[in-house]
Structure formats: structure tokens, C-alpha cells
Amino acid sequence: MRKYETVFILNPALDEEGYKANVEKFKGVIENSGGTVDNVDLWGKRKLAYEVKKVSEGYYTLMNFTADTELPKELDRVFRITDTVIRHMIITQE
């Protein structure tokens, strides 16, 4: 099992409930695949450094998790097919 960190930005058109529901969805993907979520840090709505997909702000979330090496590929797939995700990044912690 390895430690990973992901940051994802969600569409600002979501309300607070939609934002938290999406975060829970991604936590569920990790936990249902045998991983554990170590930390979730909700940064809230912030301005983007540059416009992405015609939006200039978004809901930022930092999530630390522990999982096997296949889980980041599945999480990346889920991020890509979720319309509310503007940007995401998954890195390995050392």
C-alpha cells in the first residue's frame, strides 16, 4: 500500500450540498476499492490562476489516501468522467 495525495477542483455552479456529495462520491471510490482516506481538506471556493473550461473559480479539495497501485488509475477514470470536475491531479507521497 502506498500513500497518495489528490487535489481536485469542482465546478463553482454546484451548491454546498452538491460539492460535499461529490467529495463523498470520491471518498467512496477509494474506500470501496480497498483504500483508506487519511485526510480530507475542503478549501472551499477559490479563484483559479487562469480560466479553465470557461470558469474562473472552483471548489478546491485536498485528499490524502492510502491504497494499492491500481486505485489511482480507477480514481483518475472517475475524475475524467465526472462532469463537475474541472481539474484534478493525483501524486505519490514520499
Curated annotation (Swiss-Prot):
Cellular component aspect of the GO annotation: cytoplasm; ribonucleoprotein complex; ribosome
A GO biological process held by the record: translation
Pfam family, one: Ribosomal_S6
Molecular function via GO: small ribosomal subunit rRNA binding; structural constituent of ribosome
Key words of the record: Ribonucleoprotein, Ribosomal protein, RNA-binding, rRNA-binding
Disulfide bonds listed in the record: none
PANTHER family, A to Z: MITOCHONDRIAL 28S RIBOSOMAL PROTEIN S6, SMALL RIBOSOMAL SUBUNIT PROTEIN BS6M
Protein purpose: Binds together with bS18 to 16S ribosomal RNA.
Protein family membership: Belongs to the bacterial ribosomal protein bS6 family.
Protein name: Small ribosomal subunit protein bS6
